[in-house]
């Protein structure tokens, strides 16, 4: 079956934003206008198509990134827009991170009242990391306190972006009724709230001067990004709308400019123009650089590694990245993947090059939020899902078995909060372990482990809401009732001075003995650098087949910690000497010797505990400012800055996670429910000595 839509007519985009900026509502409207749903779903009614999990419909927030395909016609040409709706709540950053990795462009939705919020900054940084071109949509222009100008200014100041304003709002708050297109200099007026009666008219006379000024600024901005246009502009030539749009498209894809549009998605205003902008300014898969990878077993960036390049074309060998695993209630396990090159038909075998295993693509689906369409073939640049993968997980590469390639995987942040959980009945016991392992397969930032000393099951995640949703899903989807402990902070251990340590593991009991002997130099690394292992053995004093066992022994010992049982981080270990025994040495013996070595070194290295510090932003009415600041101080917080936003005050602070449990509830009661806050993990910091002592004593007593 030939390709239905040419590659240059495909757009893979994500809709990303702060919680409550109106992201899902915007997606709903897009699906409505592209003819994908005949009735609009409302988030506040709990019927939104993209929010198809019960928890999402109850909480009115988006938790999983649903992928959807929508057609759109512009100037008589048919385009296909693949949309990934991502959550804005910080506890679910993993969803944003993994969607951005496979997108070509993004729509960033801002709340016209609040402007750039903390999560908007996080998302913007994530999009920068993956070089994703984007357009901005200033939503909620009909709300009291909305200001388009302020929002544009904040995009400039807070995000360091260059906003290219392509539309101006007509009216604001309850008088918002349309937009001015600065290219055609025509006004689009919405005469009803369904977006059916839309008319193009002349710009209202009183807005004409402002529109002309804004148009000149826009032309100048576009001309500056392209030498040819600059010349024409300086010669005083009038640039055509086509030239300007072409220039803006190029500047957007090169990430020099960010087009800004406005509207009110809930009132169906501005969404059709947003779809036009997606097609006009955001890249097709062909506009993005070719994808690169390595041969299986090699690491990108190492010396002498051969870099393999795949062009975006149906004729190249099949290459795709799995970016999400979902347990679907009807068809079982689904793996969403993005095809970067080549094509594949259902029933074919592919190689999972990350794990070195074959996978059969039994059924291929194209997803529409929660309804699915079976397809026979999937082509370069498309997003699809395979049913029942045996060996594939998030971040894995699947490719043509005859042309293996491994793409760079997706890196996820480490969990910062943990909680004990136990089944209520014996019958729940087995169901719970199945449920937890399935949920951990879906979500790489959710971890499950058993505490060796207490035998408790511990779950770890990115925040209180994250773990709450996991427990909730366990109850609903897997019918497991469980008791939860209080959330606990996931501390870390590290050393503060270099240590030279020698350890020998020798065991002589009749028959074959055990012998491993290592000398390792341990040094502290700067915060956030993780673990670095250096093999400095010369002359084969330890044979090279035992070196990986030494590294593994160190890594395993680091996981279980030394002074209080927390993972050891920010450490460099240089293996420089040791010895072996012809008969008695084994991988096991060297693993144990390395583990003993690490434990002793940490004890001698003036160890300290590190605690996670959260970046908190609280928006409060002026009269509660003192209360909010006092509260931060009582939580060992460090105020970073206070600024006015409209008639509210925004307080930014760094606060230890240990002191933030239940913060939202306390804040609501202290401010009569009028203040809001958002927080995200920022970094680890040394714990004050008295507190560290208390924790170590408590842990050793247990």
UniProtKB/Swiss-Prot annotation:
Query: What is a single Pfam family found in this protein's UniProt entry?
Result: GTP_EFTU
Gene Ontology cellular component terms for the protein in this record = cytoplasm
Q: Where does GTP bind?
A: 17-24, 85-89, 139-142
Domain tr-type G: from-to ranges: 8-286
Extract the InterPro entries matched here.
EF-G-like_DII, EFG_II, EFG_III, EFG_III/V, EFG_IV, EFG_V, EFG_V-like, G_TR_CS
Q: Which residues form the signal peptide?
A: none
Coiled-coil segments, which residues? none
UniProt record similarity statement: Belongs to the TRAFAC class translation factor GTPase superfamily. Classic translation factor GTPase family. EF-G/EF-2 subfamily.
Its function, per the record, reads:
Catalyzes the GTP-dependent ribosomal translocation step during translation elongation. During this step, the ribosome changes from the pre-translocational (PRE) to the post-translocational (POST) state as the newly formed A-site-bound peptidyl-tRNA and P-site-bound deacylated tRNA move to the P and E sites, respectively. Catalyzes the coordinated movement of the two tRNA molecules, the mRNA and conformational changes in the ribosome.
Give the protein's recorded name: Elongation factor G
Native organism is Chloroflexus aggregans (strain MD-66 / DSM 9485)
The uppermost taxa in this organism's lineage are:
Bacteria, Bacillati, Chloroflexota, Chloroflexia, Chloroflexales
